[in-house]
From Swiss-Prot:
Record-linked InterPro entries: Ribosomal_uS19, Ribosomal_uS19_bac-type, Ribosomal_uS19_CS, Ribosomal_uS19_SF
Designated name of the protein: Small ribosomal subunit protein uS19
Source organism per UniProt: Prochlorococcus marinus (strain MIT 9301)
One Gene Ontology biological process: ribosomal small subunit assembly
Superkingdom of the source species: Bacteria
Length: 92
């Protein structure tokens, strides 16, 4: 279930301030954030935001198709290394 329209999208205040400051300064440096639940807004297009996945910050370049999604969707937290193979010649 989505967020109520009358409330508007959630975005961390500190992240919003950093993006707006970079827009006024025409600066496109990487912004580090731990706020995976922040919604991607149109004013973020063209920025690179480093989203924390629990271990490191993963750089995410924001495009038009990402608007309305959350930052955490583009920084996976789990690594899949494949299923364990059976030993060769093992009998059940």
């Amino acid at each position: 279930m989505g967020r109520s329209l009358k409330k508007g999208p959630f975005i961390a205040d500190s992240l919003l301030k950093k993006v707006e400051k970079q827009n006024t300064d025409n600066d496109k440096s990487v912004i580090k954030t731990w706020s995976r639940s922040s919604t991607i807004l149109p004013l973020m297009i063209g920025h690179t935001i480093a989203v924390h996945n629990g271990k490191t910050h993963i750089p995410v370049f924001i495009t038009e198709q990402m608007i309305g999604h959350k930052l955490g969707e583009f920084a996976p937290t789990r690594t899949y290394r494949g299923h364990i193979r059976d030993k060769k010649g093992a009998k059940s």
